[in-house]
Structures are given as structure tokens and as C-alpha cells.
UniProtKB/Swiss-Prot annotation:
CDD domains: MFS_HXT. Glycans are attached at N425. There is a cross-link at K45 (Glycyl lysine isopeptide (Lys-Gly) (interchain with G-Cter in ubiquitin)). The gene is HXT4. Residues 1-56 are annotated as: Disordered. It comes from Saccharomyces cerevisiae (strain YJM789). It is found in: Cell membrane. SUPFAM superfamilies: MFS general substrate transporter. Residues 38-54 have a biased composition (Basic and acidic residues). Belongs to the major facilitator superfamily. Sugar transporter (TC 2.A.1.1) family. This is Low-affinity glucose transporter HXT4. It comes from the Eukaryota. Residues 25-37 have a biased composition (Polar residues). Low-affinity glucose transporter. Can also transport xylose. One of its GO terms (cellular component) is plasma membrane.
Length: 576
């Protein structure tokens, strides 16, 4: 027996089965041990002893960036689901300000003019998020039943059905409303399955970057949606909004076609017994031969995990409330990160940017939306670099602090120059320009940190056994907050106007402290190692110093990372 295998056997009592596995990246999120499965641990131990020779895994080496071109293109195609979501966000913000849309789906004043009431505007904009929340929980299961690829294709088809209903709407707002709910069901499934598939096929060295591409596609969709609204605003008929919807239909068809070239999740292939296909999928992702020993080793990791799952039986919804393996703690963290992403205030600008900047006296708020879309899209490229260079945790902390500063300036200028003494005081081009500048700064900070990283954190945090359930719940929290913000923003803005910015500022301050005390660093870890980090109970603010069990030296003190008796201020500002 090798020294590594001997070490793993000696530490089997104090470590989870994941510790006995290779640090090699697998397509699974973790080699899970579950709270109700003490028997599973014993079975897994027996399984490992019977396969002792396979524990001497060969790790797939890191290669130059050029070697990952193929897998990057495949992941971009999967991430195109984010473009579909972003397209809806970018176009709906303009629809509610377009004359033909208002005439068809609004109400009539006594003087013959048409308008959209706050209730109807809020419902049309935000009901999409409710559909997404339901779709994420219900339809994400398709990925477990029929594979990630087929699951994605099905939910995109559902999105297309919703688009058709919206395009076919003549003058019944509730028909358009129903279409948005159905489209939301599809996008909700996409939002869970796309990051999941990307995380499962990505090499560990670039996993964070590739998962972040989902957010990059969202920003591209928002930007091009803004541009399309700008191009159709001069029309006086339904071309204003039907052309953007029709293009959304085309984008969905493009994604379905592209999915035929994407490799299936190796984890799913192993689960259904397609071992050779799993080898080819891993080989394609890592630019190696399917007969490479490292590929065989990684398949064995997946097989061991799948075998452990089969021994344990099907995962129940109640299992997500386990505290023994920190599943419930992870779920709370994932749900909070997704909720706080919405509470940063980004959709205040994305959904109602056209309306907001009309209120500050700008002549063409559609042009302003395009500028914001460019900033948002371009900044996301920076975020793709930062997430692997500086890590998830540090980026979230930096983002919360910088966005707080931007929101303070935005709200203060609006309150003092445009809403003094709680009353609207005309408009000011100077104040409006200042607010646009700091909105751009805000969007830069958001796009580089809080926009992509919650998707990355959630895709690599949850144990394999309950992954789809936990990701769906966490994402549903994001959609629900999106609905609440989208629906109530017209009412809140009407009552307190730019004081609304201080509400988001408070949420950003809370976000900083929450990340510091509850979000661990997972940069550079395999999905199995992330599981071990959680199960060992490492304190989040000490997690950057954590070392996986099979890489520790004799002087490594694991207990030091699990306890901290320092005062509050030293935990935050003391030497780490």
C-alpha cells in the first residue's frame, strides 16, 4: 500500500469518505456523506477497501489556456441560457415605456390617453420571477431524470411556448401575463441546470471562470435587449415589442441547436451505466485521451460516489435539513447569497432604468440604458478574471463595500437635488449626469463581483446527493426577491423616490458582514474538497488557509481553523 493510501486509511475515522477520494475534479459536486446514512459511511469504507489500488489516483494536470478552447466553447453554449434570461430583463424594461405596449395592455384615462397602473406594471414585470422560482424547483429535476442536456432542451422549449403566447397577445394584458409566467418556468429551469452542467464538465482550474460565463451571457442579453428596444422605439405599432420577443424565440432555437454539440455530464453518464461515454466527456473537457490513466481515475471517483448514493437510497427533501454534514448550513448560505444578490439593488436599474432616468430629466433614457448595458457587459469580463485570481470571498467583500459607496452617492444626489424635503423639485441635468456616472460605477462593481459569484458559489457548494434540490431552492430565493423588488418598486419609488437607494445601501452593509462570517473560500478546490471543508467545520474567515487532508504537512493544525476566541474587531481586521 502506498503512503498516501495508508494515510487515508489511518484518517478514515475522523474524515468523511470524500477525504479518501482523489483531489481530482469529478463532475459531481461532492462525494457526499449524509446525515441519515451512517450505514452509507460503513458501506463506502468497505467499497474503498475493495478498491484500494484505485485510490492511488493520477491527477489530470493543468494545461495552457489554449488547451481548454473546446470545453470553453461548449460551456459558453450552455451558458447561453443566461443570454435568454438577460434578453427578457433588457427588453421588458423598455416595453413598459413604449406607446403601443401601453395602449394595448394599459388602461384609459378620461382624456383618452393610455397608461399602465403601478399594479399592472409591477405584475407584468415581476411575475416572470415567480414563474422562474416555480420552474427552478420543479423542472430542475429533469436534469436528474433525463440528463442535464435533455433537461435543458426541455426547459428551453417551455420558454418558447411562453414567448409564443406573449407574441400572440392582442390587447388582453392577462394573456401576456400568462405567457410571462410560462416563459419564467423555462428560465427557472435554465438557471439551475446551466450552471450545474457547466460545473460538472469544467476542469477544476477554470471552473469558476466558466460558471461565471453564465452571468456574462446574462449581461450580454440585457445589453442587446436594450439596443433592440432603442432600435424599435420609433415605430408606432406592435413592432416596438413583438420584434424583440420574436428575437427571443430565435435565441432559444439557437440554444437548442447548440446543445447537440455539448458533452453530457460525466456524473449522469456513470449513473446510467454509460462508462465509455463518461470517459469521452471527461477527456474532451480536459483535452486528454479517453485512455489516459487520469481519466480512468476520475471515472473511478465518480463510480465510487454513485455507488455510495445507490447504497444510501434516494435523497429525500427532508435530508436538506441535515446539520451533521452541514447540508442545512450550506443551503442557508446559498439561499442568503442568492437573496442578497437581488437586494444589492441591481434590478432596480435593470427593470426600471428607463423610468428612473426619465425622472431625472434626461432627454433619451433609452440611450442611457444602452450605456448602462455596455458597462454591465464589459465589466463582467473583469469579473471572470477576478473570481479565479482573488477568490470568491474576497471579491464578494470588495464588491459589497464599493457598491455601498456608489449607492450612497446615487441616493444622496437624488434626495438632495431632485427630492428635497420629500417633494419632487423638477429635474437637473447635472444631478442626472452625476447619478448616471455613479450608477456606472455601481454596475462595474456589481458585474465584477456579486453578479457572477453567487452562481459559482452555489454550483460548487452542495453535496452531490442533494445538489439539484438545494440549488433549486437557493435560486428560487433569488427569483422571489426579484419578484418582490420588481412588483413593489413602483410603489416604493412613488412614496420615497430616491430614498429607496438607502434601503439597498443597508442591505449592502449587511451583505458585507454576512459574507465575512458565513461564506467560506472555495477557490482552487475540487468539488470533493469543498465538501470536506464544510464537514470539518472550518470558520469562513479562516477558510483561505485551509488545506485538503491529502496535502497537509506534519505541522498543519486543523483545529486552529475551527476555533477563534478573538474579539469581534480582531476577527475582521486582525492578521489572518
Amino acid at each position: 500500500m502506498s503512503e498516501e493510501a495508508a494515510y487515508q486509511e489511518d484518517t478514515a475515522v475522523q474524515n468523511t469518505p470524500a477525504d479518501a477520494l482523489s483531489p481530482v475534479e469529478s463532475d459531481s459536486n461532492s462525494a457526499l456523506s449524509t446525515p441519515s446514512n451512517k450505514a452509507e459511511r460503513d458501506d463506502m469504507k468497505d467499497f474503498d477497501e475493495n478498491h484500494e489500488e484505485s485510490n492511488n489516483y493520477v491527477e489530470i494536470p493543468k494545461k495552457p489556456a489554449s488547451a481548454y478552447v473546446t470545453v470553453s466553447i461548449c460551456c459558453l453554449m450552455v451558458a447561453f441560457g443566461g443570454f435568454v434570461f438577460g434578453w427578457d430583463t433588457g427588453t421588458i424594461s423598455g416595453f413598459v415605456a413604449q406607446t403601443d405596449f401601453i395602449r394595448r395592455f394599459g388602461m384609459k384615462h378620461h382624456d383618452g390617453t393610455y397608461y399602465l397602473s403601478k399594479v399592472r406594471t409591477g405584475l407584468i414585470v415581476s411575475i416572470f420571477n415567480i414563474g422562474c422560482a416555480i420552474g427552478g424547483i420543479i423542472l430542475a429535476r429533469l436534469g436528474d431524470m433525463y440528463g442535464r442536456k435533455m433537461g435543458l432542451i426541455v426547459v428551453v422549449v417551455i420558454y418558447i411556448i411562453g414567448i409564443i403566447i406573449q407574441i400572440a397577445s392582442i390587447n388582453k394584458w392577462y394573456q401576456y401575463f400568462i405567457g410571462r409566467i410560462i416563459s419564467g418556468l423555462g428560465v427557472g429551469g435554465i438557471a439551475v441546470l446551466s450552471p450545474m452542467l457547466i460545473s460538472e464538465v469544467s476542469p477544476k482550474h477554470i471552473r469558476g471562470t466558466l460558471v461565471s460565463c453564465y452571468q456574462l451571457m446574462i449581461t450580454l442579453g440585457i445589453f442587446l435587449g436594450y439596443c433592440t428596444n432603442y432600435g424599435t422605439k420609433t415605430y408606432t405599432n406592435s413592432v416596438q415589442w413583438r420584434v424583440p420577443l420574436g428575437l427571443g424565440f430565435a435565441w432559444a432555437l439557437f440554444m437548442i441547436g447548440g446543445m447537440t454539440f455539448v458533452p453530457e455530464s460525466p456524473r449522469y453518464l456513470v449513473e446510467v451505466g454509460k462508462i465509455e461515454e463518461a470517459k469521452r466527456s471527461i477527456a474532451l473537457s480536459n483535452k486528454v485521451s479517453a485512455d489516459d490513466p487520469a481519466v480512468m481515475a476520475e471515472v473511478e471517483v465518480v463510480q465510487a460516489t454513485v455507488e455510495a448514493e445507490k447504497l444510501a437510497g434516494n435523497a429525500s427533501w427532508g435530508e436538506i435539513f441535515s446539520t451533521k454534514t452541514k447540508v442545512f448550513q450550506r443551503l442557508i448560505m446559498g439561499a442568503m447569497i442568492q437573496s442578497l444578490q437581488q437586494l444589492t439593488g441591481d434590478n432596480y436599474f435593470f427593470y426600471y432604468g428607463t423610468t428612473v432616468f426619465t425622472a431625472v430629466g434626461l432627454e433619451d433614457s433609452f440611450e442611457t440604458s444602452i450605456v448602462l448595458g455596455i458597462v454591465n457587459f464589459a465589466s463582467t469580463f473583469v469579473g471572470i478574471f477576478l473570481v479565479e485570481r482573488y477568490g470568491r470571498r474576497r471579491c464578494l467583500l470588495w464588491g459589497a463595500a464599493s457598491m455601498t459607496a456608489c449607492m450612497v452617492v446615487f441616493a444622496s444626489v437624488g434626495v438632495t437635488r431632485l427630492w428635497p424635503n420629500g417633494k419632487k423639485n423638477g429635474s437637473s441635468k447635472g444631478a442626472g449626469n452625476c447619478m448616471i456616472v455613479f450608477t456606472c460605477f455601481y454596475l462595474f462593481c456589481f458585474a465584477t463581483t456579486w453578479a457572477p459569484i453567487p452562481f459559482v458559489v452555489n454550483s460548487e457548494t452542495f453535496p452531490l446527493r442533494v445538489k439539484s434540490k438545494c440549488m433549486a431552492i437557493a435560486q428560487a430565493c433569488n427569483w422571489i426577491w426579484g419578484f418582490l423588488i420588481g412588483f413593489f418598486t413602483p410603489f416604493i419609488s412613488g412614496a420615497i423616490d430616491f430614498y429607496y437607494g438607502y434601503v439597498f445601501m443597508g442591505c449592502l452593509v449587511f451583505s458585507y458582514f454576512y459574507v465575512f462570517f458565513f461564506v467560506p473560500e472555495t477557490k482552487g478546490l475540487t468539488l470533493e474538497e469543498v465538501n470536506t471543508l464544510w464537514e470539518e467545520g472550518v470558520l469562513p474567515w479562516k477558510s483561505p488557509s485551509w488545506v485538503p487532508p491529502n496535502k497537509r504537512g506534519t505541522d498543519y493544525n486543523a483545529d486552529d481553523l475551527m476555533h477563534d476566541d478573538q474579539p469581534f474587531y480582531k476577527k475582521m481586521f486582525g492578521k489572518k
